[in-house]
């Protein structure tokens, strides 16, 4: 494997991880199970969606 191929693979892997980190919490109205999944820190226990702050 060439150096360019290795750098390309590392760049693609890094880009995929950036998207995961940016989407680490769910926005208001998203489906959730636990409160720590929501950006607001509040998950409705009855309807299983993220509540606003």
From Swiss-Prot:
Keywords in alphabetical order, please.
Disulfide bond, Knottin, Secreted, Signal
Listed under GO cellular component are:
extracellular region
Location of this chain's protein in the cell: Secreted
**Pfam families registered for this protein in UniProt:** Toxin_18
According to the record, the signal peptide region is: 1-18
User: Can you list the disulfide-bonded cysteine pairs?
Assistant: 25-39, 32-43, 38-50
Under the heading InterPro entries, the entry gives: Toxin_18 (IPR012623)
Keyword Lipid metabolism attached: no
Entry text on domains: The presence of a 'disulfide through disulfide knot' structurally defines this protein as a knottin.
According to UniProt, the name of this protein is: Conotoxin-like peptide 1
Q: Whose protein is this, by species? A: Orgyia pseudotsugata multicapsid polyhedrosis virus (OpMNPV)
Origin organism lineage: Viruses, Viruses incertae sedis, Naldaviricetes, Lefavirales, Baculoviridae
Q: Which gene encodes it?
A: CTL-1
């Amino acid at each position: 494997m060439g150096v360019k191929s290795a750098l390309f693979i590392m760049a693609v892997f890094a880009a995929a991880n950036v998207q995961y980190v940016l989407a680490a919490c769910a926005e208001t109205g998203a489906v959730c199970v636990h409160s720590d999944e929501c950006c607001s820190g509040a998950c409705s226990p009855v309807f299983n969606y993220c509540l606003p702050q």
